[in-house]
Design a protein with these regions (language model features):
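Bacterial carbohydrate/catabolite-sensing allosteric modules
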Residues: 5-201
Length: 201
């Protein structure tokens, strides 16, 4: 991917930000703000966050998570913050198991994405815990599978259709008018899907 980014070929990135490249990104800051605010409205204060590997997207999401918690005067223990890879079921399962073993475990776990969340959900069920009666969880992305399982995942749905359309339009513009196409980063808002995996405390 880096070779492509550093080449002279026309490139538009989706949910990745690189210097001197057009990018189409989901509004990660607002997405996490909306999601964490919803969880706090449900009276959760012990919220853990398993985030993805370091990237511009991850930094935006983590900063927003910390900011919302700070605004509500909620202290986040270092042990509640874990790192895994996006879409990595196995590593997310390990991180979830570590959180459950804490002396004061969280009442809600925020996963890096809906797909990786399945690793955590499997560990929670294997521990004999029920979602959301015993522990709440939330994902990110809003993949179609997340809306089909029971209980339905609480998540942020990214507007991938709009993002794809904008990326295609900008790529065509780069090909047809390379010297006049402005290098911009376009932010596309997502939407909160309340689902049923976050219970009131």
């Amino acid at each position: 991917m880096i070779e492509l980014i550093e080449s002279n070929l026309p490139v538009v990135t989706i949910d990745r930000i690189f210097p001197n490249r057009i990018s189409i990104v989901s509004d990660n800051e607002k997405g996490i703000t909306d999601l964490v605010s919803y969880i706090i409205e449900k009276k959760h204060t012990k919220i853990a966050y398993i985030h993805g590997r370091d990237s511009a997207v991850t930094r935006q999401r983590l900063a927003s998570f910390r900011e919302v918690m700070k605004q509500h005067d909620i202290v986040v223990p270092n042990a509640y913050i874990r790192e895994t890879d996006y879409r990595d079921i196995q590593r997310t399962a390990i991180a979830t198991a570590e959180l459950l073993k804490l002396p004061d475990p969280p009442t809600c776990i925020l996963f890096p994405d809906d797909y990786a969340a399945y690793g955590g959900i499997n560990v929670i069920k294997a521990a004999g815990l029920r979602i959301p009666e015993d522990i709440s969880v939330a994902g990110y992305d809003g993949i179609s599978l997340a809306t089909k399982i029971e209980p339905k995942m609480t998540t942020i749905k990214q507007d991938t259709k709009t993002m794809g359309m904008l990326a295609a339009e900008k790529l065509i513009a780069l090909i047809e008018k390379p010297s006049t196409t402005e290098i911009v980063s376009i932010t596309v808002p997502g939407i909160l899907l309340p689902g049923a995996t976050v219970a009131s405390q």
